[in-house]
Amino acid sequence: MPTYRTPDVYIEEISVFPPSVAEVETAIPAFIGYTANTTLITAGDLVNAPRRVKSLLEFESYYGRGPTYTVTRANLDEAGNFLSADISNSYVMYDSLRLFYDNGGGDCYIVSVGAYKSSGSPVDRDEVKAGVQAVAKVDEPTILLFPDAATLNADDLAAVQQEALKQCGELKDRVAVLDLRQGDPNGVSFRDKIGINNLKYG
């Protein structure tokens, strides 16, 4: 109790209730893409099954680590010293998730759309769209991300992005982060193909 220096009537309030403002997560992203592992108990049971994870370590315990990289060309100077390398990798979701946690990320949802492929077309439009549709059943995610889809051709990428925007427009509780293709730095192809529906959610 404080010591008062002047005579007067003082009222002290004693709080019997905890503070009424509770900490609430404001944004929970959902990462949709390919993973090393797609099986937890039965074959493929992690595919298109949104799962909440709290850390990169927990992600790795369910889904495995990132893909192996293929060096397609190494550039050397005249003395034979390494300058740079061209690396081939179609799967970037693991790296995106790692950067998310490196920058203070918290809980998020993971939707595996399949395992890494060693041959054929690495990223399939219909698989990624199915992952986007699967996350619609979960109420918590507020941000949809599908970084692996950026390697699709322009038409297929636009189809996936339109599916995500459609979901955001219907549910009205989430937004989508839409990546541009590497060959479209000014976004001309993106603007031509994305359409006009639900753009405020992207």
Which residue stretches match the model-derived regions?
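Surface-exposed assembly/interface segments
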Residues: 1-202
